[in-house]
C-alpha cells in the first residue's frame, strides 16, 4: 500500500504496531533525538508534546521520527517488497512523474492555520 499522506502513513505504522507514542513532554534540544536514536530502525516515534527553548509553552504541534527507520518500513511506504526497492528506484528515475498542482483552497496543508505566530517564544 502506497500512502498518499503523512497521516495515512502514520495510520499504517500504527496498524503494524511500529508507531510508538510518547505523551509526556520531551525537550527538542536533547531528549527527542536520544529517544529517536534508541528506537532507530525498530519503531517510529510520535512525540505528542515536544517542548523547547524556541517553542511556545502551549505548543500543539507533534513531532514524528523514524517513519522509514528500516528497509522494511521504507519498502512498505513505496508499496514494494524489500527486494523490489532498487528496481522501483531505477524505474522512478527513468520515468519521473510530473508534479500535480492543487489549488490553494484544496491543499491539505491549509487544514490547520495559525494566524498569530510568536517566533520568539
Identify the meaning behind each predicted range.
Residues 1-121:
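Extended, highly charged
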Amino acid at each position: 500500500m502506497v500512502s498518499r499522506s503523512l497521516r495515512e502513513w502514520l495510520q499504517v505504522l500504527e496498524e503494524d504496531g511500529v508507531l510508538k507514542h510518547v505523551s509526556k513532554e520531551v525537550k527538542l534540544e536533547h531528549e527527542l533525538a536520544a529517544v529517536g536514536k534508541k528506537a532507530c530502525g525498530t519503531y517510529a516515534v510520535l512525540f505528542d508534546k515536544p517542548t523547547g527553548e524556541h517553542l511556545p509553552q502551549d505548543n500543539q504541534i507533534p513531532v514524528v521520527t523514524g517513519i522509514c527507520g528500516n528497509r522494511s518500513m521504507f519498502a512498505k511506504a513505496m508499496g514494494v517488497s524489500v527486494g523490489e526497492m532498487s528496481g522501483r528506484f531505477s524505474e522512478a528515475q527513468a520515468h519521473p512523474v510530473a508534479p500535480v498542482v492543487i489549488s490553494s483552497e484544496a491543499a491539505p496543508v491549509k487544514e490547520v492555520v495559525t494566524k498569530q505566530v510568536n517566533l520568539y517564544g
